[in-house]
Design a protein with these regions (language model features):
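Intrinsically disordered terminal extensions that flank WD40 beta-propeller domains
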Residues: 1-204, 558
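Conserved short-loop catalytic and cofactor-binding motifs
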Residues: 5, 413-416, 474
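WD40 beta-propeller repeat fold
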Residues: 139, 143-339, 347-363, 418-420, ...
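Acidic, glycine-rich loop-and-beta core segments that form the ion-binding/anion-interacting portion
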Residues: 362, 368-416
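Long, repeat-rich segments with strong aromatic
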Residues: 372, 432, 436-442
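Short acidic alpha-helical/loop segments enriched in Asp/Glu that coordinate divalent cations
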Residues: 391, 451-461
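A surface-exposed beta-alpha-beta supersecondary segment
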Residues: 396-410, 460-493
Length: 563
C-alpha cells in the first residue's frame, strides 16, 4: 500500500531532525576538545563565586521527655475475642455492659480533650512561673535554675531609666559639633559581629537591651508570643558538634519563654520595655490583647492589662513613673496607672485607623507622639484630657468626642503638631532628651524634627511643625519581614543617634542631624535583613539586631571577638 502524503512528510521531518541532532553532537564534541565551538571566540573564565553567608546553627539539645498521653483506639480492636456461639445470656449482658461503660468513658475522654484544646487556644490571664513559661521548650538540665540565677543577679543594683538635658549636644559652634560627630563615628565604625544565636523560634518582632553595664542581656519578642532572653557574651556551654563549623556555632546563652498564649501569630509580641523604675523586670505587649510584666525578683509573669480582641501595637513608659501608654489597631491610645487595678484606664480614640506607635516625651511626659496608618504623625498635650472626670476609674472617649474637645475653647492646645507623610507612618519616637523626633514611613523616608523646649512651655500649637531633615531609606519590607523602625539610642551621655535595619542586610546608624555615622555589615555572616534593632542604654558601642528567622546578632568593638 503506497504511503500517504502525510506519512512521507512525517518521515522527512524525522530525517531532518536526526541530521540536526547528529550535527549538534559533533559540534559539542569538537567544543570539548578545542575548548570552544568557534575557535575565534575564546571562552571567558567564570569569576570565582563569593561564599554565601551561612546562618548560625542552633545548638542541638536533647528533647524534654513528656508523659505519654493515652491515644484513642478502635472499639473493634480493643474488643476481646469471644466465642459468641457458646456465650450464655448472662455473659452477653455482662459483655454489653462493659462495652457500654467503655464507650461512655471513651466519649468523656474525647470531650475532655476537646475542652483542653479549646482552653489551650485562649489567652492566659493568670500568673505564670518560669516552669510554666518554659513549657515544652527543649532545655538542658539546670537551664531553668541558670535563668533564675541570671535574673536574680540583675537585682544587685538599680538602673532607673535616664533622661537627657533638652539643651545637650546643641552647639553654637559647628566645629565643636563636627568634633563630637567625628569622635562618635570613629567609635561606631569600629564595631563588628561578636556574637550570633537563634534566640527565638520565629520572626523577631521587638527587642530591648537591659541597662546593666557589665552585661549584654537582650530581650527579643517573636511572632508567636515567645520571649527570648539572650546573654550574648556569656561563656557558651561546651558541646562538641563535629558537623558544625566553629564560626557557625552559637555564642552566649539564651532561654525561651512562652510569655503570651496561644503560640500563634495572634500573640506576636509587639513591644518590650525594661521597667523604667529599677530595671528589675520587663513589660511585654502582644497581639493577644494583653500586657504582661515579668518580675526578675519572683520569676513570675503577671497580667497588667487586657483588652477585648484588639491588637496592642505599642507601649511606652515615662522615666521614674508608674504610668503606661498603649496604642492599638483601632486608633485608640490608653493611659494606665500601674499602681491601680488593671480594670481602671483612660482611653482616647485619636485616629480613624491603626496607631502603630506611641512615644512619651521623657522630659515632658504630657507630650505624646502617635504614628498612624492614616499617614499622620501627631503631638498631643494630654494634660487637659486627664482633667476630664472618669467615673469608676474608666474613661473612654471616641473619636467624635475627642474632635469636639479639640474644637472647643478649652481644647485648642490639645493637638500641638501634625505632619502628613506620603504613606503610612510605621513609627515615631522622642530622643532621650525629649527634643528630637525621628519617624519611619512606607514612603521610603526617615524624617527628623527638632522641637525647641520653649515651645512646650506655651499653650498654642507649634507655629511650624516641619521636619528639618529627610533621609531616603528603603522601607518596603513586604509581608515576610518585620516593619523597619528607627530606634534612638537610649544613652543620654552621648551625641544623639539612632539605628535602623537596611534592606541590603546592613545596620545603619545616623546622628540626630541626619549624618550617616556607620553602616555595619558582614556579607559572610549576615544574609538577611536586620529588621529589629536596639542599643545598650549604658554602653555606646553595643547594638543588637534580629531577623525574620529568629537569628540575632550582637555588634560591638571588634577586639571583643577574641576575648
Amino acid at each position: 500500500m503506497p504511503k500517504t502524503t502525510y506519512e512521507l512528510e512525517r518521515e522527512a521531518n524525522i530525517a531532518r531532525n536526526r541530521a540536526l541532532i547528529e550535527q549538534l553532537e559533533l559540534k559539542n564534541a569538537a567544543a570539548s576538545v578545542t575548548g570552544s565551538v568557534n575557535p575565534k571566540v575564546s571562552a571567558k573564565p567564570k569569576p570565582p563565586q563569593k561564599p554565601r553567608a551561612k546562618p548560625v546553627q542552633p545548638i542541638k539539645r536533647e528533647k524534654r521527655i513528656l508523659e505519654d498521653t493515652p491515644r484513642r483506639a478502635s472499639a473493634r480492636l480493643r474488643k476481646s475475642v469471644i466465642n459468641l456461639v457458646d456465650e450464655t445470656a448472662a455473659q452477653k449482658r455482662k459483655r454489653e455492659q462493659e462495652e457500654e461503660a467503655w464507650r461512655r468513658n471513651e466519649e468523656e475522654e474525647r470531650l475532655a480533650a476537646e475542652e483542653r484544646a479549646r482552653e489551650a487556644k485562649k489567652a492566659r490571664h493568670h500568673e505564670l512561673d518560669l516552669e510554666v513559661l518554659a513549657g515544652q521548650e527543649e532545655w538542658e538540665p539546670g537551664a531553668l535554675s541558670g535563668l533564675s540565677s541570671r535574673l536574680q543577679s540583675l537585682l544587685q543594683a538599680r538602673h532607673p531609666r535616664r533622661r537627657g538635658d533638652q539643651d545637650a549636644f546643641v552647639f553654637d559652634n559647628s566645629k565643636r559639633e563636627n568634633v563630637e560627630v567625628a569622635a562618635l563615628r570613629e567609635r561606631l565604625q569600629n564595631m563588628a559581629i561578636v556574637a550570633r544565636a537563634k534566640v527565638t523560634q520565629d520572626r523577631v518582632y521587638s527587642a530591648a537591651y537591659h541597662p546593666e553595664p557589665t552585661k549584654d542581656l537582650i530581650f527579643f519578642g517573636d511572632k508567636h508570643g515567645q520571649l527570648g532572653i539572650w546573654d550574648a557574651r556569656a561563656p557558651a556551654d561546651e558541646t562538641e558538634e563535629d558537623d558544625v563549623d566553629r564560626d557557625q556555632r552559637e555564642a552566649g546563652k539564651y532561654w525561651r519563654l512562652q510569655v503570651h498564649w496561644p503560640a500563634t501569630a495572634q500573640s506576636s509580641i509587639s513591644c518590650i520595655k525594661v521597667d523604667p523604675i529599677d530595671a528589675h523586670g520587663v513589660y511585654t505587649s502582644a497581639y493577644d490583647s494583653t500586657v504582661r510584666s515579668l518580675s526578675f525578683t519572683s520569676g513570675i509573669s503577671r497580667e497588667v492589662f487586657a483588652m477585648e480582641k484588639v491588637l496592642i501595637t505599642s507601649m511606652d513608659l515615662p522615666p521614674a513613673s508608674h504610668e503606661m501608654w498603649l496604642s492599638d489597631a483601632e486608633g485608640w491610645v490608653t493611659h494606665l496607672d500601674l499602681r491601680e487595678d488593671k480594670t481602671r484606664r483612660r482611653a482616647y480614640q485619636v485616629s480613624d485607623q491603626k496607631i502603630g506607635c506611641v512615644s512619651v516625651n521623657p522630659t515632658n511626659p504630657a507630650f505624646i507622639l502617635t504614628a498612624s496608618n492614616n499617614r499622620a504623625l501627631k503631638i498631643w498635650d494630654v494634660r487637659k484630657l486627664r482633667k476630664l472626670p472618669a467615673p469608676q476609674g474608666v474613661l473612654e472617649l471616641e473619636l467624635e468626642d475627642v474632635e469636639k474637645i479639640k474644637e472647643s475653647k478649652e481644647g485648642t492646645a490639645i493637638l500641638r503638631g501634625e505632619w502628613k507623610h506620603d504613606r503610612s507612618v510605621t513609627s515615631a519616637y522622642w530622643d532621650p532628651r525629649g527634643r528630637a523626633i525621628v519617624s519611619t514611613s512606607y514612603d521610603d523616608a526617615l524624617r527628623i524634627w527638632d522641637i525647641q523646649p520653649s515651645l512646650m512651655t506655651k499653650n498654642p500649637p507649634f507655629p511650624d511643625f516641619r521636619p528639618f531633615a529627610r533621609i531616603r531609606h528603603n522601607c518596603q519590607t513586604g509581608k515576610w519581614l518585620t516593619m523597619l523602625k528607627a530606634q534612638w539610642s537610649p544613652n543620654p551621655d552621648v551625641y544623639p543617634h539612632f539605628t535602623i535595619g537596611d534592606m541590603d542586610h546592613s545596620l545603619d546608624i545616623f546622628g540626630w542631624k541626619g549624618d550617616l555615622l556607620a553602616k555595619l555589615s558582614d556579607k559572610e555572616r549576615v544574609s538577611a535583613t536586620q529588621a529589629v534593632t536596639c542599643s545598650h542604654p549604658s554602653v555606646v558601642e553595643r547594638v543588637a539586631s534580629g531577623n525574620g528567622s529568629g537569628r540575632c546578632v550582637l555588634w560591638a568593638p571588634a577586639h571583643l571577638v577574641a576575648e
